[in-house]
Amino acid sequence: MEQEQDTPWTRSIEHINTQRRGNGQQTQKLEHPNSIQLMDHYPRITSRADMHKQIVCWKQWLSLKNPTQGSLKTHVLKRWKLFSKQEWTN
């Protein structure tokens, strides 16, 4: 089984749960977030339509199997161009 590389990107999307032990010390548990946890980090001021678009994009990103940095960059750029075109035409 292939182990995930520790990159700034993977570190930035790790979700940190802080728990308190009986003696007051803090422990941190790192886990890969699902799309709902990722969306919880977005500001709550976006419209429902914008929020739906963001959720769809995150679900598509999470569905990619073992993406390389190059393929991710290409995928994101294509999605961004498509999204930008739609924004200008609306």
Swiss-Prot record:
Biased composition (Polar residues): 1-28
Family indicated by similarity: Belongs to the influenza viruses PB1-F2 family.
Site description Low pathogenicity, residues in chain: 66
Region called Disordered, residue ranges: 1-30
Pfam families: PB1-F2 (PF11986)
Oligomer and partners: Oligomer. Interacts with human SLC25A6/ANT3 and VDAC1. Interacts with host MAVS.
Annotated segments matching region Mitochondrial targeting sequence: 65-87
Compartment(s): Host mitochondrion inner membrane; Host nucleus; Host cytoplasm, Host cytosol
Lineage of the organism: Viruses, Riboviria, Orthornavirae, Negarnaviricota, Polyploviricotina
Main location: host cell
BP GO terms, sorted: symbiont-mediated perturbation of host apoptosis; symbiont-mediated suppression of host cytoplasmic pattern recognition receptor signaling pathway via inhibition of MAVS activity
UniProt function note: Plays an important role in promoting lung pathology in both primary viral infection and secondary bacterial infection. Promotes alteration of mitochondrial morphology, dissipation of mitochondrial membrane potential, and cell death. Alternatively, inhibits the production of interferon in the infected cell at the level of host mitochondrial antiviral signaling MAVS. Its level of expression differs greatly depending on which cell type is infected, in a manner that is independent of the levels of expression of other viral proteins. Monocytic cells are more affected than epithelial cells.
Keywords (A to Z) from UniProt: Apoptosis, Host cytoplasm, Host membrane, Host mitochondrion, Host mitochondrion inner membrane, Host nucleus, Host-virus interaction, Inhibition of host innate immune response by virus, Inhibition of host MAVS by virus, Inhibition of host RLR pathway by virus, Membrane, Modulation of host cell apoptosis by virus, Viral immunoevasion
One term under GO cellular component: membrane
Protein name as annotated: Protein PB1-F2
Note: Is not encoded in all strains, and seems to be dispensable for replication.
Species annotation: Influenza A virus (strain A/Silky Chicken/Hong Kong/YU100/2002 H5N1 genotype X3)
